[in-house]
């Protein structure tokens, strides 16, 4: 009985102990491959040791560097698979992962993120997040000290994964200070393998290493977390440095005589146990590596163990190196941090600690030191520059753009010389010149698009393209807006709209465009950047880039141009019923806008997503998109010029200038000399009222069959030919009127109303309440039959033509003619 009791008691204890333990599943997010013999290799090895010792499950994701979408998907997949302990070695995206962890702060999910100590949020609302700061400053100082001391060439190098001009260079400075502390006369060559955050490219790093070796460097340091740089040194007969914490001598023997060792297995085992046992400490301290453990510390700080093969060190230097290492091991008690106490920081930081040293935070936020023995090597020396545009595309765009500019200049000369031609005056020559000028600006912007990207061309081509389209579409919009206002005037009220009343509207649209462009340039950080071509690791090209604020400004700019296109579509729809061909540009405008919209919404928007999804940092999609934009701009502008000006040139070529005609034929009739032969015999100079009555009676006696034989019939030329009972009598202008920019003064018939020839380019509509004109009431089917009085021979002799359109009301014939 006692045995049974004790057995039950033991089982209860075991079950109780098991119930108090939490389940833990690890998900490891690696920046590169776990076979890199570097940081990723060591953390993956530590993961396997945790699995082995604690009997838990884990998953691993690799090659997440520079790819936030992949990081996001890896985190989601990890949580969906039940992982509650996520470990990240992606130092470049530590902020992104820290912010992402906030989405799960109310869940039992724990995080260990490799980053910097200043990345914890303030106020700190992430209790289950530990930030692992691998502080290798002293390790890099130690390796720089040895490299400079035993260098045979007096030159050592360093390859940084960060941008030398803009980014902090903490490890670079630590390596350099160690070098000058052992040999002040050393020459320090620095090069960056950073091409737009493409800083983990092993082939590029290998190539840069060979470049530094060719310049006499025999030791190369780097903050890259793999050994590709050291392999290049070894392949060229040099000595490798172990810079990642891996014990390279186990694999490469004497080829890596100097390194340091970091063991992460015990650290991960200890932290995982706190999750399983429920002893996780919220807002825990940051783990900082050092040469020795701090006395009395309770954290899990890995110890840096220096590894030195003294066979490669001359005896005269061995004691000096041993003394330096002993100082580093006792740095906590003696406060020996030589990388923080160099005189080079005197001109950088005014505020220091009482001992004359800067703080660790100040050192972490320091740029590359300025010293005479530091030489920066341009990383483009290893690469071949390749233009993003092929020569054939560049020559084609350049040739077509220059030819189109030449055509536009000829068109401007043509319009200026023949500005009094009827078809040109009806279309407002000044606005035609503005349209062509806008096209010239567009073609100039296209030429800049085909040139290599620089800071100036990146800014200038967008300015030219946007301003060109604003002048082109704005002038077209405002010019036809006036036509709509004048012809959509059923009550014939007087309206005077001159060019000078329209110019401010065009200028206002242009000002809005300039303001958006200024916002884009001021906030967008527009610049040219070098990017490695994805198809070749030894070629680069320049592309234009901007930040997120610049992208927002570009979206606003595109929306602004879209509104102009919609406005132009609306105006072209409203003027489609204008029955005078010289004023009706609805068809060419609609076609031009359709082509532009097709290019914008069909081609560009379809190409852009597929290009961006292929590679966010690759220059090929960017260059392809820019090429498409450039070709579309040239094509749409050239076609628009042909549509808007082709019919005008054809009319002048076939019909002549028409300087003595008040208005042209409507879209449904034409005046032909053959049609008017019967009227010419009986028509007079238009000033004799009786002769007009005779012509009227003669025309009235024509039978229906004769009317049908006429090849052309006159349709009432009104404002909009919607009603068959509305018509307007047009008085022909005098010669003085021909100096006006528009050849069609539309006036009421009321006696005493005349045309003011002093107001250039002015339309006038007068309300006439004394007369109401209708069609002939004798036959309901022939209300729109009008008689024409036109003497072709007299038009050639007189200075102005007399044109009358007569109507009949209440069976009374009334002929109105203008003397």
Swiss-Prot record:
InterPro entries: GPCR_3_C, mGluR/GABA-B-like, PnrA-like
Sequence ranges on the Cytoplasmic membrane side: 416-428, 479-503, 572-587, 646-819
Biased composition (Basic and acidic residues): 748-768
GO biological process, one term: G protein-coupled receptor signaling pathway
Comp. bias (Polar residues): 726-739
One GO MF term: G protein-coupled receptor activity
UniProtKB keywords: G-protein coupled receptor, Glycoprotein, Membrane, Receptor, Signal, Transducer, Transmembrane, Transmembrane helix
Superkingdom of source: Eukaryota
Protein known as: Metabotropic glutamate receptor-like protein O
Organism: Dictyostelium discoideum (Social amoeba)
Taxonomic classification: Eukaryota, Amoebozoa, Evosea, Eumycetozoa, Dictyostelia
């Amino acid at each position: 009985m006692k045995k049974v009791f004790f057995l039950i008691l033991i089982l209860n204890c075991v079950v109780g102990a098991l119930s108090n333990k939490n389940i833990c599943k690890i998900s490891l997010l690696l920046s590169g491959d776990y076979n890199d013999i570097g940081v990723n290799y060591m953390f993956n090895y530590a993961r396997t040791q945790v699995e082995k010792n604690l009997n838990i499950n884990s998953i691993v994701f690799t090659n997440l560097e520079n790819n936030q979408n992949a990081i996001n998907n890896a985190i989601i997949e990890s949580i969906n698979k039940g992982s509650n302990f996520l470990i990240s070695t992606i130092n470049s995206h530590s902020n992104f992962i820290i912010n992402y962890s906030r989405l799960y702060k109310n869940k039992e999910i724990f995080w260990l993120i490799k980053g910097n100590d200043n990345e914890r949020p303030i106020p700190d609302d992430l209790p289950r997040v530990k930030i692992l700061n691998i502080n290798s400053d002293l390790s890099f100082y130690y390796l720089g000290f040895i490299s400079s001391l035993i260098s045979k060439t007096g030159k050592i190098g360093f390859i940084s994964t960060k941008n030398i001009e803009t980014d902090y260079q903490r490890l670079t400075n630590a390596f350099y200070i160690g070098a000058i502390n052992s040999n002040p006369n050393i020459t320090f060559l620095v090069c960056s393998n950073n091409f737009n955050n493409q800083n983990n490219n092993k082939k590029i790093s290998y190539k840069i290493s060979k470049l530094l070796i060719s310049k006499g460097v025999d030791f190369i340091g780097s903050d890259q977390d793999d050994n590709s740089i050291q392999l290049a040194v070894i392949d060229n007969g040099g000595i490798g440095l172990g810079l990642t914490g891996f014990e390279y001598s186990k694999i490469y023997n004497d080829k890596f005589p100097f390194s340091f060792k970091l063991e992460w297995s015990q650290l991960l085992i200890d932290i995982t146990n706190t999750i399983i046992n429920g002893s996780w400490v919220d807002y825990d301290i940051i783990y900082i590596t050092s040469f020795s453990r701090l006395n009395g510390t309770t954290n899990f700080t890995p110890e840096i163990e220096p590894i030195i093969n003294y066979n490669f060190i001359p005896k005269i230097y061995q004691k000096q190196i041993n003394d330096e290492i002993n100082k580093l091991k006792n740095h906590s008690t003696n406060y020996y941090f030589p990388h923080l106490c160099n005189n080079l920081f005197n001109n950088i930081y005014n505020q220091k600690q009482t001992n004359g040293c800067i703080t660790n935070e100040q050192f972490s936020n320091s740029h590359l030191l300025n010293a005479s023995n530091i030489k920066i090597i341009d990383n483009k020396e290893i690469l071949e520059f390749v233009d993003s545009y092929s020569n054939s595309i560049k020559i084609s765009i350049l040739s077509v753009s220059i030819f189109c500019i030449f055509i536009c200049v000829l068109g401007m000369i043509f319009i200026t010389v023949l500005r009094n031609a009827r078809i040109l005056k009806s279309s407002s020559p000044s606005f035609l010149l503005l349209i062509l000028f806008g096209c010239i600006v567009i073609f100039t912007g296209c030429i800049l698009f085909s040139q290599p990207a620089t800071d100036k061309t990146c800014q200038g081509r967008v300015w030219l393209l946007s301003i060109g389209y604003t002048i082109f579409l704005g002038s077209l919009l405002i010019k036809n807006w006036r036509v709509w206002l004048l012809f959509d005037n059923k009550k014939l009220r007087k309206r005077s709209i001159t060019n000078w009343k329209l110019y401010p509207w065009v200028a206002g649209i242009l000002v809005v465009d300039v303001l958006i462009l200024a916002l884009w340039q001021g906030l967008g950080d527009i610049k040219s950047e070098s990017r490695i071509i994805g198809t070749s690791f030894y070629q680069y090209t320049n592309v234009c880039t901007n930040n997120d604020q610049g992208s927002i400004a570009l979206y606003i700019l595109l929306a602004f141009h879209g509104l102009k296109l919609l406005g132009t579509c609306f105006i072209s729809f409203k003027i489609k019923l204008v029955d005078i061909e010289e004023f009706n540009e609805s068809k060419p405008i609609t076609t031009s806008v359709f082509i532009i919209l097709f290019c914008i919404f069909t081609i560009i928007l379809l190409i852009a997503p597929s290009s961006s999804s292929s590679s966010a940092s690759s220059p090929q999609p960017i260059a392809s998109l820019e090429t498409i934009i450039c070709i579309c701009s040239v094509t749409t502008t050239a076609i628009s010029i042909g549509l808007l000006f082709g019919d005008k040139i054809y009319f002048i070529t076939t019909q002549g200038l028409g300087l003595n005609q008040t208005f042209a034929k409507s879209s449904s009739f034409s005046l032909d000399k053959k049609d008017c032969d019967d009227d010419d015999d009986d028509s007079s100079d238009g000033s004799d009222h009786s002769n007009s009555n005779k012509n009227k009676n003669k025309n009235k006696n024509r039978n229906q069959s004769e009317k049908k034989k006429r090849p052309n019939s006159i349709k009432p030329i009104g404002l909009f030919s919607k009603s068959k009972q509305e018509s307007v009598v047009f008085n022909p202008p005098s010669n003085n009127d021909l100096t006006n920019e528009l050849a069609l003064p539309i006036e009421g018939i009321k006696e005493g109303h005349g045309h003011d020839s002093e107001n250039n380019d002015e339309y006038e509509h007068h309300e006439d309440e004394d007369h109401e004109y209708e069609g002939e009431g004798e036959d309901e089917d022939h209300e729109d039959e009008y008689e024409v009085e036109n003497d072709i021979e007299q038009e050639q002799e007189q200075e102005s033509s007399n044109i009358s359109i007569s109507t009949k009301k209440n069976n009374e014939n009334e002929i109105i003619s203008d003397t």
